[in-house]
Amino acid sequence: MNILSMLSNDSAVQLQLQLQLQLQLQLNLQSAPSKASPPTLLPKQTTATTTNATGNTKTVARYSAGDINILNDENSHGVDESIDEPVTNGQATNKESVKQEPTQPTNNTETEKKPLTLSIQNGADKKSLPPQSQPPRINPLVADVTLSTSKFKNVLAHIQHDQLEIDLDYKFKFESNVSLIDQLDKNQRLSQDLRILKFDEVKSNNYLISTHQFTTNYIDRVVAEDISSRNNKISDTNKNKEIIHIDHSKPLHHNSTRGKEYKWGSTREIHKVESKPKRKRNTENSETNNSRSTVSSKASTPSKSLAFGSTHHVPIRPKGSKGTNLSSSSGPITDITNDSNNVRRSSRPKSKRKAYEDGEGEDNGNNIDSNSTDNNNRNKTQEGGRGPKRIRIKLKVKPEGENEGEEKDEGKGKGRGKGKGKGKGKGKEKDGDKEEEDENNANGENGKSKGSVSSSTTTTTTAAAAAAGGGGSTGSALGTTTSNSSTSKEQKAFMRQYDNTYVAIWKDMSRKDGPKVSRLMQQSTQAKLINLKKTCILAAREAKRWQVKNTKNQKDLSTKARRAMREMFNFWKRNERIERELKKKHEKELVEKAKREEEERESKRQSRKLNFLITQTELYSHFIGKKIKTDEIEGTDADPRIKAQEKAHLDKYAGVDAANNDILAIDFDNDDEDALHRAAAQNAQNALANAQNQAKQFDDTEPFKNPDTNGEEMNFQNPTLLGDLSIEQPKMLKCTLKEYQIKGLNWLANLYEQGINGILADEMGLGKTVQSISVLSYLAETHNIWGPFLVVTPASTLHNWQQEISKFVPNFKVLPYWGHAKDRKVLRKFWDRKSLRYDKDAPFHVLVTSYQLIVSDIAYFQKMKWQYMILDEAQAIKSSQSSRWKSLLSLSCRNRLLLTGTPIQNSMQELWALLHFIMPTLFDSHDEFSDWFSKDIESHAQSNTGLDEQQLRRLHMILKPFMLRRIKKNVQSELGDKVEIDLFCDLTNRQKKYYQSLRSQISIMDLIDATTTNSSSNNSSLDDSSTTSLVNLVMQFRKVCNHPDLFERADVRSPMALVKFAETGSFLREGNDLDVSYASENLINYNLPRLIYDDLISANENKNDFGSVYAKFSVYDPENLRDLGWISSAGTSPNEIQQLGKMNVLERAIKLQRYTTGSPLDRINYLYEGDYSSPNSKLLINPQNQHMISQQQIENSSVLLDLCNISQKVYEEMYLNTQDPAFTPLASAPPITIVCSSNNFQNKLQNELFNPTIRSALAPMSLNKELEFMNNNTPLELYPPSNMLPSSLSKVNDYSNIRMPSMDRFITESGKLAKLDELLVKLKQEDHRVLIYFQMTKMMDLMEEYLTFKQHKYIRLDGSSKLDDRRDLVHDWQTKPEIFVFLLSTRAGGLGINLTAADTVVFYDSDWNPTIDSQAMDRAHRLGQTRQVTVYRLLTRNTIEERMRDRAKQKEQVQQVVMEGKATTIMSKKEDAASKKKDVAFLLLGGSGDGDGDGTGVNSGVDTSNDVSKSTTPKPEVGKKKNNGNKKNVFGNGKKRVREEDGEEEDALNSKRLQELYHEGEGEFSGTVTPAPGV
């Protein structure tokens, strides 16, 4: 049983007080009586106010026995000690403020009673600290020791101070031990009940382990004995082994006491069994320490002495208290340190102290004190930076003569106490007792020798430095002055009696009071636990009730608080954002306002600068126009009054002289308008003069100028001296020019005279080539300028130019510069000659070449000075960034003439490129030209915006001097009209699926990225690649619209042939006729052995018994047919059945074959209609003449029967005998071949295969034999069987299972081709000749197959045609009227060639550029055309082709505005088509494009009731035109087709023929519903 668990605070205090009371009473009885009875020593109370961490305050009492008083110092008003409590489980340190009250004075009047002073030494400073200074740190486990003041006061009231004096050191250690045990008991109970204070218990245990104080009193020993009684019964053999494994981490555990001996009746602690040598060494060390402590205690300095009531002071201290160390001090200050880990011994060696005499005591004591002081200073504690703490204790000492005996006893006790303090508890052996007696004797003698020194009233200082360490805690030693009256034996006996009494008391208490207290404590603990559990349950219930009530409110409160906080945060954030936005907006407005003002100023300045440049160009054009007279030649119908005003306005600036004409020096902000006009006029005059000077310098540098005469007067090659001319047609020109062509010749001649370049932009077909040739002949005839002339044309018109120059001007020598590199090298020798004169006898006059060749050989052309350069189809240099444009501009030419029928194809930039080519100095900035005209005109064409008429007039005024353009309707009255018709087609089922498949693969985001991302980047390669990908995507849609076979052709199908062909020798050995019949054989051969056939099969046939055996087993034998008597009723005898059984299948069919008058059509009508019509209904002969030929003659003649029924025969041949087979086998093979080496077998095989009867029946009857039957009037029923082989499959497949793709299906799978098929039939009937233009050469290949199938004669010209072939093809078309169709590619066959033999043009698919199509259609609509030209354009409804057509109309509008000055209104979608990529994206995203005919595309308003839209001027139709009536078919087949507005499928199906319905959905079964990858 653990006694500690039975003790509470009150019980521990009671036990302690009883123990001390009994001890004091026994000691008083044993002590010797004094001479004078001392006064009674009352215990002095010391109250302390303890403040816990919770703020509760309680009053506790400490007592001082005898006359020891802890009072205030003289220089201080009181000391407040702040006692630190241990920090447990992270709690803050609690401090107790102890206030010591002054004690009451005693009855002793002889000696002045002065209080004991408590002083604190901080570091090296030895002064007393004020009350506010930091109190000393004491043991934290002693801080909770409290004693009941009332109980303690009552007990000590009976104690006389002269009879008992309690040692302070012992009292301090006793209280500390009791407090430690009490604290440990609390921790154990708390950990046992609540299991939460384990940390405090472990900490207390660790403290006991570190200080070795867990057996310093008898309570520990009793507890250790009660824990385990078996620990004292350990055998001697296992004792040493178990001592090694002692666990010191648990001081009260049985492992810590196992193997240890207990000495009942003494104050020594538990110790291990040690050997004698070791005990001897420990005894010597203790004797040395005792001697040192005695010297230090007697060598104290004298101070204010205290009078003691008696000299017989008996110190009460435990024997051999471990950890007690006596150290000397230099003064009356004693160091008390509670932390043993911070005590450090002095490293300085201490000399052995010797006994000294009285005279030497003080000096030596002082020296020792000084040394010990230094050591103490070095042994400062490091905890918190605080110095050693010292307590000054003042003792009262009686006079020397009264108690000399007591002093002796005291000396002995003191010596004994020192010996016990230095000893380490040697054990209970006799040797140890003897050693202790020797030590006590020695100490007593030392005390006696030093007693005389301290006989006077002195103050002794006890240095109690309590420092806990591994070797033990340092206790405090009390040095007092005692007499040497008692001997060592008496002292020893006294202490033994004291120990025995102490042990007896404890045994009685443990046996009697222990169980009772234990039961009480258990009951109390259980009651407390029950109450605590109930309290916890009630508290939890109340807390839960309160929580239920307040949880919702807390949640709502927290939610509202967060929401309010969030709203406030958002409000201020929004407020700040609004303020920032307003501030930024205000700043932005200021910046924009300043920027706008600056832009307005700059705009005004640029406007004035632009107006200056335009005025300068106008004046330049006006000065040239006055000499060239373009208005008169062009023949425009403008108002003459407006022209007069404009000329008058511009004429006033003629001959002006401006002071400043440099554009960089002109101030456009301040100068007035008149000054700007004068400067512009001056610049225009200077530009004109410069142009004339350049032409003059070119003429002056000619090598053939006459040196004898004045060049300016006599040189006829300088036409600038001639002025305005009226030129007639040159005589050397072998043709007759029309009136407008002569005007054009005059305009060109005037341009040459003024040294100005020009553009001849007459409409295609008005003879630009003849006019340019005429101006060359004019220069040669009039001015003797024979060249050199350079003509650059496209490759397709090289031969045309060569032929026309040679034809119209035979005097010109034409050099055709084309061919291979070697050929061109030979041709270059004509102009490589030095000092070459170009006259009539020159090697060549005109050089004709192509754009590609001149770019490749530009270095050779730059060496020449060309008199005149003509560029045919000048739109080839429409890009000013191309190498072609730059190369041609670098040539040295006097004049340049550009021939083009379409100066503007796509945008105004192309017009600027041409103008810049002819006038590089005037039109030098494209940006300025774009600012002048391009933006407004192009935006007007696209978005139907207004156009400034004044700006348009100024544009025409600038362009007129440099460009001459006439249109056909104004100058050529005999030329027929040109009619353009758009034919709209629908997508077939296969085309719709292809179109939808492509449409599903388009991503709008990809298109947007392709049109925006790369356009903003500077990488041109990425830009080109994106454009190419978009164009390729559009091309796939166009291929679907043209024909689905452009993706994948229909395959030829045939069954798998399991056949092998016979091998033959060289074909050279064969004759002219190669017989390959029976060349194929089956892979399977049936081998028939010869012996089996000869001996078994063929031999039995010749035997007599074969017939009997055969007849016996034959089902056709008459004997076996007796049971079938009903056969005779059917008109057949058994013998006839027997004969039929011996025949094979063919023989039976031939015997049953008879001629009848009924035709196959009659049999079909008989089966399906039930009406059998007579042959007379199908006769072509007039019924009135039927008497001339008898019916019998018709019926008896097969030939006559066919002639009389031609319509029926034709119908049979076209429909009944041309139907495709309904089934195609998966595999085919010839019959299995029987292989036999017998001659009999081969003869029989040949007889069977080549039976004459069977062959004559299968083959048609010969005409001679049929004539013989007719002459003999043999009835038709008696004709021999013939022509039994069916003819329906023979006409289509020729007895073959190979299935070729159906051409009818090929035509009907494309909506365009089906429409073209109908159109060509109509055109051929009306004797038209057709030009068909294509964009894809692969589509031209498909068209050739179609024309071959339809047996139309055609020729073809595309980019792969050679130059010589092109010339021959054009010649054949013009001279051979039997050619019906001319297939051309738009780019190759649409330039420069004359195809006037055709009066119909068909565009199977349109070009991106509308001008390309215009040039292509003008190949037929040109001079020489006498018939009206009709242009058909095939367009697929609701597809990309319609949107391309709309875009082309916008470009045509730009041409009409610029060239003709017409600002007509067009309707189109507002799309930004500034670049080609955006044009392509517009085409892809413009409409639904699904081909469903739902009208959701761009042109949903196109007239769906009409397949043909006819217009002379291309204009889109606005809205839907309702036509409730019927429209006659334009194809002229005599039938009317009705098409309802609602587009219901029933009406559409009713309007189609059976063949169209049959072939329309065949694309669904082809297995190719998606385009092939990679196409």
Curated annotation (Swiss-Prot):
Its EC number is 3.6.4.-. Residues 42-57, 100-109, 285-297, 364-379, 441-467, 475-488 have a biased composition (Low complexity). Disulfide bonds: none annotated. Residues 505-630 form the DBINO domain. One of its GO terms (biological process) is telomere maintenance via recombination. ATP binds at D762, E763, M764, G765, L766, G767, K768, T769. A motif (DEAQ box) lies at residues 872-875. Residues 1315-1470 form the Helicase C-terminal domain. Residues 1488-1498 have a biased composition (Gly residues). Pfam families: DBINO, Helicase_C, SNF2-rel_dom. ATPase component of the INO80 complex which remodels chromatin by shifting nucleosomes and is involved in DNA repair. The DBINO region is involved in binding to DNA. Component of the INO80 chromatin-remodeling complex. Belongs to the SNF2/RAD54 helicase family. This is Chromatin-remodeling ATPase INO80. The gene is INO80.
